[in-house]
Structures are given as C-alpha cells and as structure tokens.
Amino acid sequence: GVSSAASDVYKRQVYDYKILASRLRELAYLNAGLRISLTDRRVVNEEDGSFKSEVFYSEEGLREFVRFIESSREHLINDVIYLNSEKQGIPIEIAIMYNTGFSENVHSYVNNINTIEGGTHLAGFRRALTRTLKKYAEDSKMLEKVKVEISGDDFREGLTAVISVK
C-alpha cells in the first residue's frame, strides 16, 4: 500500500496526453508490428460521446521513424538506408536519410530507451559511417578531385539517423 506520507506528496498525478502520445508513437516505430492504443477518458468527443483515442502502429519501424523525423526537410535521397544486423548476439537496427541541411540529427536507443547523451553505440556508428564513406570516396577517387581533407563532420552534415540496440 501507499504510506500516508507518500499519499500526501502524490495527491494527484496529471498526465499530459501529448507527451504520452509522443512516447507511444516512438515505441511503435522502435518495435515494428507492435500496435499501441492510447485512450484519454478525460476528453469526450461532443459529437459522438467517444473518448479521445489514438492507435500507434508502424509496419516498417525505423524506416518510418526516419521519414517521420524528416517529413519537413528536403531530402538528398528519397530512399531510407536501412541496416539490420546482430553482433555478438546483440541486435542492432539503423535507419538513415540525408537532407539538404547542415546539422546532424541522430536519435539513439538501447532497449527502447533514448540515450540522449550518446554512448558507445553512437560513437561506434559515427566511426563506422566515417570510415565507410571515406573508403568509398578514396576507392572511387573522389578525394583526388577535390584536394581537400574530409572529416567525419563532413559526412554527418544533413544526416538524420535512428539507431536501436536491443
């Protein structure tokens, strides 16, 4: 049970529908095929008497998540670059798009929890992205033409990515 001291502190919990909806939408994207329903019994539709309700579902998971994040930007490539692999028994999923902007927008998750401060999975992703794109540029002799040293920051301009480790 709840002690009297706790009930004095936690008299009434107010839930913000927008915050809950945002998190449940995020979880649906992170778990393709999972259907999540949210019903707010505090808000009644005057026309039909129903409660405010929303269903979150994503067939394509991270691919759709990146498209959702990118919906207001101009894309360099319309296709989502998608990787799904397992390393040392740990599933990892990555979805990437590039836009015409200059900033990097990377969302990383471990076990469906947003790792806002990054982590080794994010650092590893950035290193691998830089190494892979730099090798491609060198192999295709693109760097000889520009005569400029390219850094990891250059490859991350306009990048939107979602990384999920489970």
PLM ranges: what are they?
Residues R12-V14:
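Outer-membrane beta-barrel proteins
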Residues K18, E26-L27, G33, S37-K166:
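GHKL/Histidine-kinase-like ATPase module
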Residues G1-A6, Y10:
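Single conserved hydrophobic/aromatic residue that forms the stacking wall/gate
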